[in-house]
Amino acid sequence: MSEGIKDQPGLSEAAAQSRASVLRSRAESYIALSRHDAAIADLTESIALMPGNARAWRLRGESHRVLDRHEAALDDFDEALKLEPDSAYALGSRGQTYAAMDRLEEAMADFEHALTLSPDSLWILEAKADALADLDRLDEALEEHSRIIRLDEDLAYSWVARGDLYQRMHLYQEAIDDYTKALEAEQDHVRALSRRGEALRMADRYEEALADLSRALELDPGNDRALGSRGAVLSELGDNEEALKDLDRAIELDPDYIWAYRVRGEILQELERHEEAVSDFTQALRLEFGD
């Protein structure tokens, strides 16, 4: 009899296995509903009943990861991998946890191992690309994003992800082209519209940028980044009052939006509202540098 079942003397081994299985299944539905604390409670009982089930450890680790409980997640993924050393899912999830903790070399080791087991796993490839970008290995990250697109050219998200990397590399036309591909796959993809609008702004194509950002905000009125970008575009087009409305709303939605404070401060300075400008620049410095 397993140690877990010994802890539940009122249950036969068959009953304990059955209860543990149902708890795992219910936990998966809780996870799908983003009810991660409820999932963790079920999985903790399931593990107590059947500690040798790798899936239960992995699922609980994933819930801990989503809740940013990184140390607990690592402990669970380690246990899952003791039981199933070649679980690409557990390796990929542990890699994501390491990446969130800025332990990027360990993350890369897990992603590389996972991809030897599941070479075409899009989410693991995506996580590896993100880690490479965080390591400032941008050309390698770009290769991974291109590989993802080759595997499935119909996924809007994959085009957006590569577009974001191009934008980070200041390759704005390439970014615009990728966001356009994303929008061909999914015409109302809010992030693609918002990010293409930002790339167009950086390319000084303000009217086109305004159209994209306004469409993004029709679809998602609370998109603080689209509001910030549109505010900057409106200012470039000479409409500072409307620009300030967008930036006010962006900061209301995200009081820690450093870039929006900087842009609003510059507009206020242009309008000779210097006390307000000083306040915004001071807030930007406080948020970014702790002044």
Please give the residue ranges for each predicted region.
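Alpha-helical tetratricopeptide repeat
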Residues: 1-291
